[in-house]
C-alpha cells in the first residue's frame, strides 16, 4: 500500500473500490485527483485481472490498497474504511460517467456546512422509482462520518458482496442522522450488462438485489426506504412520507 502524504484529519477521505475498471476508472480519477475538497484518495483494487493496477500506478497521488482474489465491493470498502485517516468519508463508485468537480463539491457541501450528517447522490440513471421518491437508497455515492463505519469494519467483512449500502443505511437509521439528497443530473453509472455482457451482467444485477434482500428481507427493504425518507433533510418530503406511511398502515 502506498501510504501517501500527511492529510488534514478534519477533511475528507475519498474511497473508490475497483474491480476490472481499467476502461472506465479514469473518468472519476481525473475529477477527484487534486480536488481541493478531498484530503486523500484511497483506491481499493479488488483483485482486478485487467490493467487496473497498472493504470493506478500512473496516479502517484493515490493511496492504493490491493488484494487477491476478488472479494466483492463490501469487503473492499471495509479495507478502505479501515485505512482512512480523515473524519469524513466520500464513497464513490469506479464506473461513474459524467462526474464533474462541481458534483464532488455538491456532495460534500451539505455535510461540511453542517446542514446534514450524511449526503447521498441521486444520479440521472437511478431507477425511476428512486427518482420519483427522491432517494436512491442503494446509491454508492455518499459522504458519511468516518465513525459511522469505523467500528463496523469486521461486520462489513462478513457481509455479502453487495450488502454494504443497506448495512450502512441501518446504521444511519439507528442514529437518526439527517440526510441530504444531492441530485447529479448528468451523472450515470455503467450498468453491469454493458461491462460483462447481457447474460453475466444480468446475473450480477440480480446478485446485487439478492444481497440486499439477504441482509434485510423483502419487507425490510421497504421499511428501510421509508425510514431513510423520513430522515431526508427536506420538510416537504418528510411530510409526504408521513402521509404515505399513514395511508399504508390504515
Locate predicted features.
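Conserved donor-nucleotide/metal-binding helix-loop-beta segment in metal-dependent transferases, i.e.
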Residues: 101-122
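Cell-envelope/extracellular polymer assembly enzymes that use nucleotide-activated donors
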Residues: 11-13, 40, 167
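Short aromatic/hydrophobic "clamp" motif used to bind/position activated sugar donors
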Residues: 89
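Conserved short acidic donor-positioning loop in nucleotide-sugar-dependent glycosyltransferases
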Residues: 32-33, 46-47, 71
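Hydrophobic helical membrane-anchoring modules
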Residues: 2-5, 173-250
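Short, well-formed alpha-helical segments that are part of the catalytic scaffolds
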Residues: 20-34
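A conserved acidic beta->alpha catalytic loop
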Residues: 45-53
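Conserved donor nucleotide-binding strand/loop of the catalytic core
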Residues: 39, 53-83, 119-122
Amino acid at each position: 500500500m502506498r501510504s501517501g502524504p500527511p492529510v488534514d484529519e478534519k477533511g475528507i477521505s475519498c474511497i473508490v473500490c475497483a474491480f476490472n475498471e481499467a476502461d472506465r476508472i479514469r473518468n472519476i480519477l481525473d475529477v477527484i485527483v487534486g480536488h481541493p475538497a478531498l484530503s486523500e484518495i484511497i483506491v481499493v483494487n479488488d483483485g482486478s485481472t485487467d490493467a487496473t493496477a497498472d493504470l493506478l500506478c500512473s496516479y502517484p497521488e493515490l493511496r492504493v490498497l490491493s488484494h487477491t482474489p476478488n472479494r466483492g465491493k463490501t469487503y473492499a470498502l471495509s479495507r478502505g474504511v479501515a485505512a482512512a485517516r480523515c473524519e469524513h468519508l466520500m464513497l464513490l463508485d469506479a464506473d461513474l460517467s459524467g462526474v464533474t468537480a462541481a458534483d464532488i463539491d455538491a456532495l460534500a457541501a451539505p455535510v461540511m456546512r453542517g446542514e446534514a450528517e450524511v449526503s447521498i447522490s441521486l444520479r440521472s440513471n437511478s431507477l425511476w422509482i428512486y427518482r420519483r421518491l427522491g432517494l436512491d437508497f442503494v446509491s454508492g455515492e455518499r459522504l458519511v462520518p468516518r465513525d459511522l463505519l469505523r467500528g463496523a469494519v469486521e461486520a462489513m467483512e462478513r457481509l455479502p458482496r453487495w450488502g454494504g449500502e443497506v448495512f450502512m443505511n441501518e446504521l444511519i437509521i439507528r442514529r437518526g442522522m439527517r440526510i441530504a439528497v444531492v441530485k447529479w443530473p448528468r451523472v450515470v453509472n455503467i450498468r453491469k450488462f454493458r461491462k460483462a455482457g447481457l447474460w453475466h451482467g444480468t446475473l450480477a444485477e440480480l446478485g446485487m438485489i439478492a444481497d440486499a434482500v439477504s441482509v434485510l428481507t423483502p419487507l425490510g427493504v421497504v421499511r428501510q426506504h421509508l425510514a431513510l425518507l423520513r430522515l431526508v433533510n427536506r420538510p416537504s418530503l418528510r411530510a409526504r412520507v408521513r402521509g404515505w406511511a399513514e395511508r399504508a398502515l390504515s
